[in-house]
Amino acid sequence: GSDGAERTSVAHATLDAQGKARYQFDLSYSVPRIDPTVVDHLHTGSIAVTVEPGGSQVVSTVRQIRQRATISYDPNARPTIMGSPAAVLSRIEEVIGLCDLVKASDEDLAWLYPDATVEEVLRYWTGLGPTLVVCTRGPAGATALLRDNRELLQVGPIDVPVADTVGAGDSFMAGMVSGLLSVGLLGGLEARQRLRSADWSAVQPALHRAI
């Protein structure tokens, strides 16, 4: 450790018999100053957006950075920290409206919108602003929607033994973001325009990479 370093947030994960995790959090964070001229893509998510005082700082940073960079977001609901859906939904939807890419799990959607289907939520979210929205569905794979292509894309799963699900959503997001970056569909304002005009043939390889 370092005597001079700031405290960082810690998540303690406890696994059940199926490998699903329950978390306890020890939170402490602030957003460092970022030079927007050196950023082409910014990703954020979960409690970083919804928990204060850092949450407001994150939203302010997203608003600044998106003037020249693409933005991705994973709401990654944590009810034990976030409280009720009503307490965080307006902030989550605010950030969704600033994004190019949004990914959430079916569990996230069920918590945030208990009376809506996955398709209804994805269509609602594209109306807020993002070009590509994706819902991961565990053993059922993923469902995706492009804002200007009203046909849902179903991406099948890969059958593998599951030891635990810790980091599964983050791994999916990392694969998808890196896949879109590698083909120029994320990473700066020109990439934003390319993503907006992309069809499924351009986007699908990144989704398979994420799976």
Predicted regions and their residues:
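Conserved N-terminal subdomain of the carbohydrate kinase-like
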Residues: 1-51
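Glycine-rich, flexible loop/turn motifs
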Residues: 8-11, 21, 77-78, 151, ...
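Conserved beta-strand segments that form the floor/walls of ligand-binding pockets within enzyme
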Residues: 24-26, 43, 72, 103, ...
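Short gly/ser/thr-rich secondary-structure transition/capping motifs
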Residues: 24-30, 81-87, 115, 195-196
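Conserved beta-alpha-beta core of the PfkB/ribokinase-like small-molecule kinase fold
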Residues: 41-124, 130, 139-142, 147
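Conserved phosphate-binding/catalytic region of the ribokinase-like
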Residues: 114-211
